[in-house]
Every structure is written in C-alpha cells, then in structure tokens.
A protein has these predicted regions:
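Non-ligating segments of multi-cofactor redox enzymes
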Residues: 1-217
Length: 217
C-alpha cells in the first residue's frame, strides 16, 4: 500500500470504513489517522499520518508468536489465525509500530462486504487483532477474476473510502503496477526504516519528514 501524505486531509473516512467493514470492537482500530505539527512558531504546519499494520517482510510479531498464530501469507499479508492465538500479547509487545489490539469482548456481526456476498464475522474474546488488508475482499475479488488495486471489489475498504485517493493498493512484486510506479517516481518511503522490518506500507512525503514517534495505543 502507498499513502500520499500530500493528499490526506485527515477526514478519518478510512477509519470509519475499516470499522464498518471489519466490525471491530469498541476501542479497537485497525487504522487511524494522527495529526501532528511540523515547523516552529509562527511557521507551523498541521499534517496527517494514517497508521495501520505495516505487513513487514521481517515482521517481529511473527517471529515472537509462540503458537504460530501470526503468520505471513504467500501474498505477503501478515495474518492472525484466531484459533491458534493464546492471547499472550507477545506480538503486541514486539510490534514496533504498536498497531495490534487485544479485543476483550470479541464480536459477532453479519457484514455485507460486497453487493454479491454476505459473510459472517466472528471473533473470540481476548484474541489479538489488526489490519489484514481486508484479505476477505482480496480473496473474493481474485476468485471472481478481479485484480486487487484495480477493481473496487478487490480493494481494502480504506482504499475505496478515501475521498481524495490518498491510498493506493496493489502488487509490490509487479514492476508495472500503479503502486510500484508511485514508489519509484514519488520516492515512497517507509515509516521508521531504522527498525529493519521492511514494511509493505509506503508513504509519499517528499520534503516532509515523517514524525519520529507515533503510537496507536
């Protein structure tokens, strides 16, 4: 995913779309938009920074999970098998971006993710949750011949909801994809490269230094 910080207006449409799509519990946010200030008075500028799971190539959360609940899929998405999660919260401690939440109540809801598909979302109490790039939408789209990052029904909900098209989704392994083009031509950069986790979420912020530290929780 690529997020263009020049386009983001801090409207939180992505946050609301995520909660509606994934029926996350109270106080559980798989994506959030932070606002921060740059510069010094009187030349101060307010900026916005959307945060979500970075789906790292070298994910610390996967490395520390004792039960194998956290795993990396073939497509690079870091996912959680709730049937294996033992609620130890080791992954929450290990994640340097602090984008994992433990849902104490669990949830059960029927969500209409697509016009042609209804699915039941059920989560057990105490299970750790996070952004999964709306993998159910991606899988449904691919199964119906759609291309993630191109067709609406195969995109994460946050991408579709953004009114200014600040988010772009696609295949990082395809050099001809729109997301690869943006990273190359717009100098996409990752948040906290010094962590050495090789995130799959890039930001376009040429000339705008990313904040040194922001926590979701």
């Amino acid at each position: 995913m690529v997020i263009d910080l020049f386009r983001c207006i801090g409207c939180h449409a992505c946050t609301y779309a995520c909660k509606a799509e994934n029926t996350t519990g109270k106080g559980v946010f798989w994506t959030l938009v932070f606002d921060y200030e740059r510069g010094k008075y009187p030349n101060v500028i307010r900026s916005f920074l959307p945060i979500l799971c970075m789906h790292c190539e070298k994910a610390p959360c996967e490395q520390v999970c004792p039960s194998g609940a956290t795993y990396k899929r073939v497509d690079g998405i870091i996912a959680i098998d709730q049937n294996k999660c033992i609620s130890c919260k080791a992954c929450m401690v290990a994640c340097p971006y602090h984008v994992r939440f433990q849902n104490p109540e669990g949830s059960r809801a029927a969500a209409e993710a697509h016009q042609k598909q209804e699915r039941s979302i059920s989560r057990q109490p105490g299970i750790v949750e996070k952004c999964n790039f709306c993998k159910d939408r991606i899988e449904w789209g691919i199964a119906h011949g759609l291309t993630p990052g191109v067709e609406w029904d195969a995109n994460p909900a946050c991408v579709n909801a953004c009114p200014v098209n600040a988010r772009t989704f696609g295949n990082l392994d395809d050099p001809d994809s729109e997301i690869s083009r943006l990273i190359s031509t717009q100098k996409g950069e990752v948040l906290h490269e010094e962590f050495g986790t090789s995130p799959s979420v890039f930001y376009i912020s040429v000339g705008r230094p990313l904040p040194s530290r922001i926590r979701m929780r």
